[in-house]
Amino acid sequence: MRNPWIAAWLVSVGSLAACGPETHAVPAKRPNTELIVGEYERHPPDGETAIRFRGDGSVRLAKTRALLDTEPPLASGAWKLDGARLTVTYDKGICTERAGDKAGVYTVVISKVGIHFTKVEDSCERRSAIDGQTWWRIK
């Protein structure tokens, strides 16, 4: 008589174990073209430069975050992102003296916390300083 009860108990315990904890799908990361939109800054000792990427594809660079809305900016222009490949093209300010310096290409890793730049191609020495740096999200 014990065997049927033990068998029933083992079946019920086994079915509970098979259910296990409920798994939840991890939400997908938003596309980089959405994540990049915002303001970022460097932290010392790398500097205090700030940059704003807008949803309309414009970019603005300033000496500090407090100067992002003042004229003239260090540089302004446009950005284009294809996957993790960012092209920044300045049409005013630094990196515009020579035609070949206007655009720089970087591989970026973007998160809620910030953006990390790795240079692919950029002949502008001043902009190239961002190679290997992480800029922290302001907002």
Across the structure, where does each feature detected by a protein language model lie?
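Sec-dependent bacterial lipoprotein signal peptides
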Residues: 1-17
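Short linear interaction motif-like sites in intrinsically disordered regions of transcription factors
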Residues: 6, 10, 80, 136-137
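Lipid interaction determinants
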Residues: 19-78, 85-139
